[in-house]
Amino acid sequence: KNGHENPWNLDFFGVGNENWECGGNMIPDFYANESRRYQTYVRNYHPDHPIHKVCCGANVDDYEWTSEVLKTTHNHCLKELHGNMDGLSLHYYVHPEGWEIKGSATDFDDKVWYKSLNKALFMETLIERHGHIMDEYDPEKKIGMIVDEWGAWYTVEPGTNPGFLYQQNTMRDALIAGITLNIF
């Protein structure tokens, strides 16, 4: 009834998600200790198929989160275990008009068009600055930065269920994706 007869053959396992907010409203060192605790139970069951443990990283430019999580996970950890993680996540969404009123997915002017594309370029700054912090704790670059949530996020379309976060895509979104992928 419960479980699965065979292993799922996972490639990546995120130890938490958005723990700084909806994933627990945790402060960095509390989450880092929880990550240290729970990653212990994520084991490699086949030598040819390792599971990459991904620690919950920052939301946008919360560089303090990155620094504190890495500091805590690396404390009392053998150097060769690089904080008991293989990756550190990062989330960044383009909100042309800001978080509270994100703006329409389809009704926008040239100014908002260019503002959106410019905000997509901010991903490069985020990668560089979070990467610099990661290098302080992991100079051998054993921990990968995993940008696991990104793109454009607009106000929910009128008449749709707000819990489903439906938004229509346009050429602007294709360009945001192209800019972002080019940075990677």
Regions found by a protein language model. Give the residues of each.
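Catalytic-core region of carbohydrate-active enzymes that cleave or remodel glycosidic bonds
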Residues: 61, 72-83, 87, 110-184
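N-terminal catalytic cores of secreted or lumenal carbohydrate-active enzymes
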Residues: 1-109, 128
